[in-house]
Swiss-Prot record:
GO terms for biological process: mitochondrial genome maintenance; mitochondrion-endoplasmic reticulum membrane tethering; phospholipid transport; protein insertion into mitochondrial outer membrane. Belongs to the MDM12 family. Component of the ER-mitochondria encounter structure (ERMES) or MDM complex, composed of MMM1, MDM10, MDM12 and MDM34. A MMM1 homodimer associates with one molecule of MDM12 on each side in a pairwise head-to-tail manner, and the SMP-LTD domains of MMM1 and MDM12 generate a continuous hydrophobic tunnel for phospholipid trafficking. It comes from the Eukaryota. The SMP-LTD domain is a barrel-like domain that can bind various types of glycerophospholipids in its interior and mediate their transfer between two adjacent bilayers. Keywords: Endoplasmic reticulum, Lipid transport, Lipid-binding, Membrane, Mitochondrion, Mitochondrion outer membrane, Transport. GO terms for cellular component: endoplasmic reticulum membrane; ERMES complex. Residues 405-422 have a biased composition (Basic and acidic residues). Residues 74-134, 387-422 are annotated as: Disordered. The keyword Transit peptide does not apply. Component of the ERMES/MDM complex, which serves as a molecular tether to connect the endoplasmic reticulum (ER) and mitochondria. Components of this complex are involved in the control of mitochondrial shape and protein biogenesis, and function in nonvesicular lipid trafficking between the ER and mitochondria. MDM12 is required for the interaction of the ER-resident membrane protein MMM1 and the outer mitochondrial membrane-resident beta-barrel protein MDM10. This is Mitochondrial distribution and morphology protein 12. PANTHER family: MITOCHONDRIAL DISTRIBUTION AND MORPHOLOGY PROTEIN 12. It comes from Candida dubliniensis (strain CD36 / ATCC MYA-646 / CBS 7987 / NCPF 3949 / NRRL Y-17841) (Yeast).
Amino acid sequence: MSFDINWNQLTIDDTINQSIKEFLDQQFKKISLPSFISNLSVTDFNLGEIPPEITIRHIGDPFEEFYEDEDNLGATNETNHNLNDERSTMGKSQENGIHKDNAYNSQNFDDDDDDDEGVDEDDDDDEYDDHDLGTINEGISLLNFNDSSTTPSGNSFGGSIAPLPPPPLNPSRDSFHSILHPYGVNSIIGATGAGSETPTNILNQNYLSSRVLPKISVKQKQPHHDDNDIQLIVEINYKGDMHINLLVNLLVNYPSPNFISLPIKLHITDIVIHSIATIAYLKKSVYLSFLCDVDDAFPDFDSNNNAQTPTSTTGGNFVDYYSNDAAINKERIDIVKKIKIESEIGEVENNILRNVGKVEKFLVEQLRNILRDEIAWPSWICIDMNDDGDDDDDDEVEDSNVSDGDGKDNDGKHGDGPTHEV
């Protein structure tokens, strides 16, 4: 199944470009820069006029991770309620014990009273022990819930699954390929409507862990399920004219630190992406996360040269970076498979230094790292499509819930259009 995208409606408002530019600029400013560059900033971003090719592979319910805050909030409230009940019960037991002690001291010490007192103490202990064991069981259930995976494989795709014991935690967030369809991604992509293989089992919940929380979200996660929520598993093939402009200073630290500072303008273009992604629509918010890359042969790779790892060109003002090393790609999703950088140092007419491959390679690696960390599963990015009037109702919730990975509040809103938060 395929559909056409009205790309002009997405790019006609520059608010989206501005929002993405500011988001990328914030991420680049968090990078620890090497000694030979400084003052890195994103000066421009544009989605371009060429849309990606998107093919729908499955339609179903959104992943439960998008609603995880609701469950955690309910579990936390239940735990606090049980804790308060336990404290209240313990307080009443202590008050009863004080009254009994006073009554006991006012009576004569005889054998019958001693026996009655012993029975009363045993009854109190039994009552407390039963309540204590109940609390332990509830804690174990809560622990199992928190440690178990929450990404549905059957439920999210309209199927049903039998209750399973909590699986062991996945020790690495870089092994998403292990939870893909057992016949491989290529089998899913190559499957036809008449074939027996479908993308229903593209995800296996037994290998996912909810302990890795996403890093980017406008409202973090949706607090409530809605009947209109929907999720698409899609194949994205992009070879468009998106471009990113960066500005950075190249430093010469000899004979002294920062002896010479040269401004470098970098133009990132020719971005190639071929991946499987999930797009979820939840209450006027769009969630996007890349699940895995699609392994295919790019003609440009084979026609250029037979080298396994191409090197940057010298003597020119652009350089291509890409890798066809299967061992590297299997370890982690790349998202960006090919990219080109054009560089300018100083004034264009006085451009003397051309070989800045070291700076370019560093920036490309950092760009890939940002995309992997922020929009590759189990992380995602959320675009809020709500109007300002709708947002007013949720301001109090957003102010209390939205924070970055360091616990700092960040509303992250840019203009009146879609917003991004960290």
